[in-house]
A protein has these predicted regions:
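NTP-dependent small-molecule kinase module
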Residues: 111-114, 183-232
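Glycine-rich phosphate-binding P-loop
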Residues: 24-37
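Small-molecule kinase domains that catalyze NTP-dependent phosphoryl transfer to phosphate-bearing small molecules
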Residues: 76-82, 162-206
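Conserved phosphate-donor/acceptor-positioning beta-strand/loop module used by diverse small-molecule
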Residues: 135-158, 163-171
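Short, Lys/Arg-enriched N-terminal segments with co-localized hydrophobic residues
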Residues: 1-16
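Pre-Walker A (Motif I) flank of P-loop NTPase domains
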Residues: 18-22
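Short beta-strand-centered segment that lines the nucleotide-binding/catalytic pocket of NTP-utilizing
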Residues: 46-57
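ATP-dependent small-molecule kinase phosphotransfer cores
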Residues: 57-121
Length: 232
C-alpha cells in the first residue's frame, strides 16, 4: 500500500484548527487501542497505530521490519543500562551507531505524525505522539490505564495465555514503552502532566471513555461530535 504525504516545515504553535488530532498513550492491556478504534468510528476519522510504521517505510524506503524492531522500544541491553545511569537530556544521544539508527527511525515516524496533524483529523495511538505534537494547537492528548488485575485478565483472554505469562508481557511491554518515552521525550510516560487528561478504562468502561473524549473534543474545539461531518 502506498501513502502520500505533503512534507511541511513545522514551527512552534502550528497545526491547522480546521482539523484536530487525538493522541492516545496506553498501558498494555488497558484497551487504549480498542478505545481509539471505537472513537474513530464515532467521530468518522481514521485511527493510526502500526499503520504509521508502514507509512514511514513507504516514505523513507527503509524496510518496514526495521521500524517494527523499534516500535515503542529501544534496541540493545546497553540502552537500558544507559537510561538507568545517565540523566536524559532532550538533545543528548550516545554515539553508538545502533542508537543513532534508532533515532533516525524515530525522526522519520515523527515527521509522518506531524504531517498527519497538519493535513487531517485523526487519532494516533502510541508512538510518543503526545510529545511529537506538543507544540501543536490542534491536539488533545489522552492517557488510558487500568488496574493490573484488569489488564492481566484482558491479556489472558486476548492472547490465550496464563495469568503469569500475561503479567510478564505487561511488565515487559510497559517497560519498553517507559524507556522509549524517557529516551525520546525526556520524561515519564505515565506522568499525567503530559496529557490533557487520564482515564481508568476499567472504572468506567470503554464506551464511557469514548464518550468522555468526545465531550472533551467538543468543548475544546467547539465541534459537534455527535454529528461529525466528513473531513472535520
Amino acid at each position: 500500500m502506498q501513502w502520500l504525504f505533503f512534507v511541511s516545515i513545522f514551527r512552534k504553535g502550528e497545526g491547522s484548527m480546521e482539523n484536530y488530532v487525538i493522541t492516545i498513550a496506553r498501558g498494555f492491556g488497558s484497551g487504549g487501542k480498542e478505545i481509539g478504534k471505537m472513537l474513530s468510528k464515532e467521530l468518522g476519522i481514521p485511527c493510526y497505530e502500526n499503520q504509521i510504521l508502514e507509512m514511514a517505510s513507504d516514505y523513507s524506503g527503509i524496510d518496514k521490519d526495521e521500524f517494527m524492531q523499534v516500535d515503542e522500544k529501544l534496541r540493545g541491553t546497553y540502552i537500558s543500562n544507559w537510561l538507568e545511569k545517565v540523566p536524559i537530556l532532550k538533545n543528548a544521544v550516545p554515539v553508538e551507531s545502533e542508537f543513532v539508527s534508532d533515532l533516525h527511525l524515530f525522526q522519520i515516524q515523527a515527521e509522518i505524525i506531524r504531517d498527519l496533524a497538519m493535513t487531517q483529523s485523526c487519532i494516533i495511538v502510541g508512538k510518543c505522539a503526545d510529545h511529537v505534537l506538543r507544540n501543536f494547537n490542534n491536539v488533545i492528548s489522552v492517557y488510558i490505564e487500568a488496574p493490573r488485575h484488569a489488564c492481566v485478565d484482558r491479556i489472558c483472554k486476548r492472547l490465550n495465555v496464563t495469568p503469569k505469562r500475561a503479567e510478564e508481557l505487561i511488565k515487559k511491554t510497559d517497560k519498553y514503552r517507559y524507556e522509549y518515552y524517557k529516551c525520546y521525550a525526556g520524561g515519564d510516560w505515565r506522568n499525567p502532566i503530559n496529557y490533557d487528561f487520564t482515564l481508568n478504562s476499567d472504572r468506567i468502561g470503554w464506551e464511557h471513555c469514548v464518550e468522555l473524549i468526545k465531550q472533551y473534543v467538543s468543548i475544546r474545539f467547539n465541534i459537534d461530535t455527535e454529528h461529525p461531518t466528513d473531513g472535520e
